[in-house]
């Protein structure tokens, strides 16, 4: 079923007592007329600029639209007229007039003549200031105008907009996967040579200074023994290396003295046993008769 369209002829006549948005000069005013509610056939027009019009501009500017009659009867179409001050540093909206198209359709007037009406101009503050005068007339039915396709171009751009998020997601995956291996490599080296614990205590100096046999012998046992306990138990003691060296030297001296005493005692006891055995043998020999 085809939609029925009718022509709507307008004559934007004039405005009266509208707000003056200029401070030092008279306003140069024009009107922007648009028909809203029909997304397939957006329509609009702009009058000429009335120079030095002030608050009472006059245009007598003709405008012609094609109106979807079914949408107008459903009260889905409206006529919007904006009064604008033309300024060098940027135009300023003085006020706006909204007219439901059904209201005009229900009061067509004579078919052969225009009907003149007046509507209040609403400022941006929702207060009325001044009035707008225009006339209108509905014509005969006409074929539907060609549908404009601005949205088709936007639809074609939607896939382009979808690519950046996908690329961002794919690029984030490679950066996330390579990060776990480095901690595993450092952990593997940590099991072979505990660098953090070695720097806390001083066992690595013995391991690096002496041959591998001594390094894997006593120095490692002392490194995994006392240095770990001092590192985890009393971290502040690592800042006092001189006291630790003195304690180790004193312990080594005591241990060396004890070992020396034990060795000397063993030598004395061995000499005593040897002397006793010699005497016993001599006594036995003395029992022989020559």
From Swiss-Prot:
Signal peptide residues on this chain, from the entry's feature table: none
Superkingdom: Eukaryota
Keywords: Cell membrane, Endoplasmic reticulum, Membrane, Signal-anchor, Stress response, Transmembrane, Transmembrane helix, Vacuole
Any Pfam family matching the protein: C2
Origin organism lineage: Eukaryota, Viridiplantae, Streptophyta, Embryophyta, Tracheophyta
Segments passing through the bilayer: 246-268
Protein name, per record: Protein SRC2
UniProt GO cellular component terms: endoplasmic reticulum membrane; plasma membrane; protein storage vacuole membrane
Stretches the record annotates as Disordered: 167-187
Annotated source species: Glycine max (Soybean)
Compartments, record wording: Endoplasmic reticulum membrane; Protein storage vacuole membrane; Cell membrane
Membrane topology, from the record: Single-pass type II membrane protein
GO biological process: defense response
Task performed by this protein: May play a role in cold responses.
The C2 domain, residue ranges: 1-114
SMART domains, per the entry: C2
